[in-house]
Amino acid sequence: MRVEAVVEVRLTEDKKKVLKALENVFTPVNIREEPSDVGVVLISTCDGHKCLEKLRGAIWRQGIQDAARSVISKGVVGEDTVIFSINKQAAYVGVVSFVTEPGESPLGPITFTVKTSNVRQFIDWLAPRTYRGKVYYEAPPPD
C-alpha cells in the first residue's frame, strides 16, 4: 500500500501549524514542498498501513467508523485507488472531520490518495462496519 497526503500551506498560514495538523493524523516518511500560487504544497508519502494508524485511531476514538466508511467508499477510484479529504483545521486539534464538498474547508483540506491491491480490505481496516455502535468485523491491516 502506498499513501500520499497533500496539503496546502497558504501565505497567511504558519507552516509549522499545518505540518502539526498533518502529523496529528498521518506519519509521513518523506515530505517535499512544491510552490503553488497560494503558497506551498506539502506532499508527504509512505508505504504500508503504519502511517495511517493515527487517522485510524482518531476515527475509532471518535466512534465515526460508519460515517468514515461511507465517505471513504465514495472516494474509490478504479480498482486500486481511494481518495478522500479531511478538514485541516480539525486535524490540527486531533479531530477527524471529512470534507465532502469543494470549499467546505476554507483553508483547504488534507487530501489522501491510497493505492492498494485490496481496496475493500483497506476500508474494512480503516473504518469497519459497526452494529449498534460495536465493530463486528475488524479486518487485518492491508498490504
Swiss-Prot record:
Highest taxon of the lineage: Archaea
Protein name (database record): UPF0201 protein Pcal_0593
Stored SUPFAM superfamilies: RL5-like (SSF55282)
InterPro entries (UniProt xref): PAB1135-like, Ribosomal_uL5_dom_sf
Pfam families linked to this entry: RNA_binding
Stated family: Belongs to the UPF0201 family.
